[in-house]
């Protein structure tokens, strides 16, 4: 990384269409901090999971694995890997795969359920 390049942070987290949470919140915060967030949604929800009924859900595990492969092929290096909501075993495996592919990246694991 060149000294003037922003730090790249892989954000492995859910994306809620409604509700002030998840990737919708962390991406602009990291960007304002001068970082380059890279979104990797584990699951897409119609709303957040706290008190708004049962949200519609779209699993992102297959997309996530394909995206990780693409980033590796491009030679992308992450300075940090941040995890948020991991909706199941496949999403946990996705985070573990990212940790294996970028062992030098700082790991920030936020457990959410």
Language-model-detected regions and their locations in the chain:
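Ribokinase/PfkB-type carbohydrate-kinase core domain
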Residues: 3-113
């Amino acid at each position: 990384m060149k000294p003037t390049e922003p730090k790249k942070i892989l954000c492995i987290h859910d994306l809620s269409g409604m509700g002030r949470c998840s990737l919708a919140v962390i991406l602009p915060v990291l960007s304002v901090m001068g970082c380059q967030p890279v979104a990797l949604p584990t699951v897409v929800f119609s709303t957040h999971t706290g008190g708004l009924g049962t949200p519609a859900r779209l699993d992102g595990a297959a997309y996530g694995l394909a995206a990780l492969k693409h980033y590796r092929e491009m030679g992308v290096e992450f300075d940090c890997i941040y995890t948020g909501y991991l909706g199941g075993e496949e999403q946990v495996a996705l985070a573990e795969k990212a940790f294996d592919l970028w062992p030098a990246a700082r790991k920030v694991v936020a457990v959410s359920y």
